[in-house]
Amino acid sequence: MTAVKEPIALLGSPAAEGPSAVVLLDEQVRHRTRHRADRRFLLVARLASLAGFLIVWELASGTIVRPFFISSPTAVVEALVEWIQSGELWFHGQFTLLATVLGYVSGSLAAIAIAWPLGLMRRAYRITEPYFLIAYSVPAVAMGPVFILWFGLGLTPKVVLAAYFVFFIVFVNTVTGIQQVPRGMLDVTRVLGASRTALLWTVILPSALPYILAALRVTLPAAMIGAVVGEFIASNRGLGYLTRAAAAEYSTAGVIAGVVVMSAIVLTMTLLLRPLGHALRWQQEVKVNRGTV
């Protein structure tokens, strides 16, 4: 009788690991397929809704609403083209972008540097908390004239105001992230003989990092707002100044064009920061704390 040779499954292949591995692999493939389909649907839906909005806006301008109030997409595009051809967009945009980036970075670093030791020393945080609460209760826009009086009319007050808009959001979330570390985890790590430095890098930092990154992702618009508010108050350059000049000329298209450019800058910078969130997918989703200090 001739022996029947059965196929030998390769080590590590789905066949060698049993039916459960095949089912798991199929489920992963279906999940990826659904994810790609959802992303395509979202992209198409967003583009379609944007196109519909622009069409309705264009049709409503001059027929339902006076162009003075809402302008029109074609007029906004014409204003943008004029700024690009004259070089105004790049000239003013670079100052706003510089103030936004410097304010964002300096405000975030200052917030983390101050919040980190206070988060570790709860008694010190409770002592200083009222002072941060008082500073946080002051409307950030109201600090614009103060910073201009202190630092003059150059780039510095715009950077400081942008940093002020960023500081408290990052500060509150950093302190929250540090204080959310489970006490039991700290005790177990100490019992195992971990040094203070090891405790900081292996337990506290990984637990607080999602809170910090969540704050960093949402404070970019705040930094842009701070820089533009400073340009609105007193400046002869920047997108805030360019938009204010358009408003002084009663150019609705110019005002909307300035808003579009600022939104595009913030959106681009936010997309550049998105990989920071993907790097911590294993962490639980964290909501940014915008509440009191």
Predicted segments with their positions:
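N-terminal signal-anchor/first transmembrane alpha helix
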Residues: 30-61
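Periplasmic/extracellular loop-to-transmembrane helix junction in inner-membrane transport proteins
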Residues: 30-38, 62-106
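Transmembrane-helix boundary motif in ABC transporter permease subunits
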Residues: 102-132
